């Protein structure tokens, strides 16, 4: 995605599987089931197909856990925020209601985009975020602003910031995994519980705590995420042998 190659991406997985199945690029040995390897680990997938269309994809994500509680960082011109940091395939700073932040609904998307990189930089400068079993996975990459849901049946709402200036239009698969891990660690979710997550535009993912797990000496969960994707087009890239830059170039 725009921020580079991540250890894991939930909405990207849902989209990729939908595209690959609908276009016949892969044929699973057992219809409706497959697994993929990601930098974060193996992800098991089920999908529901009606005719030639994939109507739902559910991924069983890597073990997810609460990394730290109550970390604080000062944002210049705004003030101090406290966050929990959880891992769901990427590290997320989760911003819940507090003195300077009541609900994401009080902020425009542009305001969240302005605050997020400052908060991320401050947290990365002050704290270390390293996966206990996969030390190559390190650094806080995403900010998850929370809020009350607006859609019927939703449990919670979020705005997930990533990259330089992007907010996820989906509820974010790894972000939903991280949020469920945070809530499970605090006794607010148990194995078998569902968690319906709403995005900034109102789209929904269906999360579920599938099992308990351990990551190093940390209690963790195995979350699953269900959602759908629709194809919107194809892009054709070709190489002109007359182009001296046909194979790319670097500036920085």
Please state what every model-predicted region is.
Residues 1-8, 13-252:
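Active-site proximal loop and beta-alpha junction motif in alpha/beta enzyme cores
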């Amino acid at each position: 995605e725009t921020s580079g190659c991540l250890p894991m991406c939930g909405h990207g997985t849902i989209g990729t599987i939908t595209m690959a199945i609908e276009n016949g690029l892969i044929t699973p040995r057992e219809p409706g089931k497959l697994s993929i390897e990601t930098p974060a680990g193996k992800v098991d997938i089920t999908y529901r197909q009606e005719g030639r269309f994939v109507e739902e994809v559910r991924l069983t994500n890597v073990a997810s856990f609460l990394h730290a509680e109550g970390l604080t960082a000062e944002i210049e011109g705004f003030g101090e925020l406290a966050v929990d940091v959880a891992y769901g395939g990427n590290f997320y700073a989760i911003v819940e209601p507090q003195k300077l932040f009541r609900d994401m609904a009080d902020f425009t998307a542009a305001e969240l985009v302005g605050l997020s990189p400052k908060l991320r930089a401050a947290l990365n400068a002050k704290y270390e975020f390293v996966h206990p079993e996969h030390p190559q996975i390190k650094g806080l990459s995403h900010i998850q602003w929370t809020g009350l849901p607006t859609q019927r049946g939703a449990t919670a709402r979020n705005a997930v910031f990533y990259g330089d200036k992007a907010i996820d239009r989906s509820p974010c698969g790894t972000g939903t995994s991280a949020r469920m891990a945070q809530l499970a660690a605090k006794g607010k979710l148990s194995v078998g519980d569902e968690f319906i997550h709403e995005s900034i535009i109102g789209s929904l993912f269906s999360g579920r705590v599938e099992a308990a797990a351990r990551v190093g000496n940390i209690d963790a969960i195995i979350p699953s995420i269900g959602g759908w994707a629709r194809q919107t087009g194809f892009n054709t890239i070709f190489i002109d042998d007359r182009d001296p830059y046909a194979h790319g170039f670097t500036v920085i």
